[in-house]
Amino acid sequence: MAKIILDENKLLYADNRKSWRAWLKGHYRTGREVWLVYYKQHTGKARVTYNEAVEEALCFGWIDSTVRRVDEDRYAQRFSPRKPGTPYSQANRERLAALIAKGKVAKEVLATLGKPAPKRFRVPPDILAAIKADPAARNNFRKFSPSYKRIRIAFIDGARDRPAEFQKRLRYFLRMTAKNKQFGFGGIEKYY
């Protein structure tokens, strides 16, 4: 597989949330993309956390996507303006609800949001049946936090129009849940 070389002119290092927000504030209207640099832990360099980076990006109508290795000490994640009309993930709806309540979302962006607030959460019947069919998964699922359940189930359900991907996500979730293991990013718990 060919190694992807990142354009050094599009790399941005923000050592904290405030500097990342300042960059977004100055570029969200005209910027097309930026690769936010995260230094690896062994370097000891300060950095904005993933959750902070996503929250600030949402405040300015941007979203996160691909992650690429830069070198031995760094990796970078692509951020770009969100395409109008694309749906928000469950995690981002929950983040946005909290950010709106705190008055952090830019007014221009707020006017375009519509209603990104969290939807009432229900486990789809087919996913619930799959969980119930595995006694270990069923028992462990009951113990997981409501936020974790919402995020993971929404992720699985988001692939419903791609049956192979839907099944792959569901099988992985069931396997991990049966082992009583949670996976994915952290930090979302603070919204509850």
Per-segment meaning from a language model:
Residues M1-Y192:
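Charge-dense, helix-prone N-terminal extensions
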